[in-house]
């Protein structure tokens, strides 16, 4: 891949037109390398017949420019290959058959963020052409010859460190160049082969990716087997240690037995020789050995006692830890039980608050209904009372009118009585005067009028006087009758006035009672409002408690979980303490074995990593070779050994850098896999938590639905009870109204008297007013109006009779 990229970069650098190159870079590269090699690159065209001076002038003017060619023009070319050797350069020079001396200029063409091999650009100073035979078929400064690096054909006025660029076309076509160097001309088939190889490589990669999980399972099984083997190894090591201890004991016992046998032999020899015990060396040696054994036994006993004491201390510490852990577990269990109790109490309180809230809500609804009913009844009563008050006022106005009419009648009666008295006085005076006149007529006849008066005139005067007297008497009787009628009317009107006053007093009393009832109803309404406010405050408190209850329940559940976790932690600590006590004896050996196994694992991992890197490197090399074969160009370069070594060194460094990058990529891949595994584990944990929460939410929703169903059932029962209660109340109200109507009707009948009172009003007005007001009155007022209806016609009949009689 890198070779192809460098070749593409070099192809981008080379063009048909000659471009400028930094002369400082050329001089620095020449001074660093100090190499001048004459390389045979390409053929000079036949049309080129310029001399050395013209070429020198061209190189002087164009020495800071680069040559770039394509497949058709064929100017000086750049070719980079890590497998290039000096022999290839020599063969290229022989094939071209051109004598030229040139200096090589090394120029690195690098792409960003890529490591590529340096590209080599060849500049040459031509001394002749193939046509005039000025060139030599073999270069003087070839790596195969040891000579001067300076070309013999270089002009004197040109610096030896300055190179010349040949812009001639080396080949007529790409096919010719490829056929000269033994390349491949069937590019399509080559590309197809490259594509097939790439597909094969991709399939192999897919197979490798598919085999990765199998290898993972194999590695897991191998790790499990390794753990089992390690356990067996630990057990065998323990057995080996025990056997070693037993062997040491047996060896010490054997040595002691040997010492005892040797001392016994010495003692037997001394006894045979007759040496006493006080002087014998064997006895002394036995005594010293016994003392030494005694001291060693004492030291061992003391060490064993110390070990026992330490073990007892450790055991006591473990027992204390166990007791502490057990206490912690018990405390945690007690805390969890208390939390459960608190949760139960809170649930009971929640249920009680819900019930109280429902009852308060029901009482609130009842109070609202009562308040609405009381308000409606109060409105109806006030409306009825207003109507009754208006009727009473109208009746009072009528009574006032009747009183005024009675007063007018009294005044008329007084005037009539005064006229009657005057008439009586006039009659008496007339009678006296008439008697006197008759007396005078009978005694004396001196008056001419009386004398001349005839007898029939006197009879006519007497008759007229009698008629006048009769008329006066009739008028007197009429006036007396009218006076009696007026007296009766005034008495009846006084009675009616007294009755109206009593009814007005009763109405005022009713109004007072109604005001008292209204005040009591208002007080009850205020009380119900205060109760409603208290119920609403209780509802708010209950809602706040209901809002806080889930939090408290959650907190209690969290505390219970914490207590359970503490209990589990305490149990785990106890178990770990026991395991640590058991593993304290063989800790060192197990640690060594683990370290050894870890080292082995590290080495195996490194080896597998190396194998993977080698495989990746081989794949990359195969791809690079394939692509290099795909992009074979007809360019060849002859380099010196030092340049080749430097290039190979750089290639090796590039390979190392690539390997380092591959290793870093592998490590990143492993880290990514680890992070992926961790994320998957976290995802599984989150999924578990989500499942648990979903289950809890489902249970909570089921409980809420059950509670709602219960609430709906209670509300339905409450509605049924209210409907039944309303029906009963309506039935009772209907019965009461019927009773009141019956009582009022009977009372009206009892109150009707045979002596009806007449009123000064027309029949049409009385009937019209009664018919309009009858619909909006209570039963009592209806009964009273019936009595008035019965009395009014009699009154009008009496007045009509009186008028007809007067006429």
Curated annotation (Swiss-Prot):
Ligase is among the record's keywords: no
Basic and acidic residues biased stretches: 537-548, 722-732, 739-749
Compartments (UniProt record): Cytoplasm
Pfam families assigned: WEMBL
Keywords, in A-Z order: Coiled coil, Cytoplasm, Phosphoprotein
Positions of the UniProt region annotated as Disordered: 1-162, 532-565, 722-789
In-chain residues carrying the UniProt-annotated modification Phosphoserine: 148
Tissue: Ubiquitous but preferentially in chloroplast-containing tissues.
Phenotype on disruption: Deficient chloroplast response.
Family: Belongs to the WEB family.
UniProt function note: Required for the chloroplast avoidance response under high intensity blue light. This avoidance response consists in the relocation of chloroplasts on the anticlinal side of exposed cells. Acts in association with PMI2 to maintain the velocity of chloroplast photorelocation movement via cp-actin filaments regulation.
Name recorded for this polypeptide: Protein WEAK CHLOROPLAST MOVEMENT UNDER BLUE LIGHT 1
Species of the source: Arabidopsis thaliana
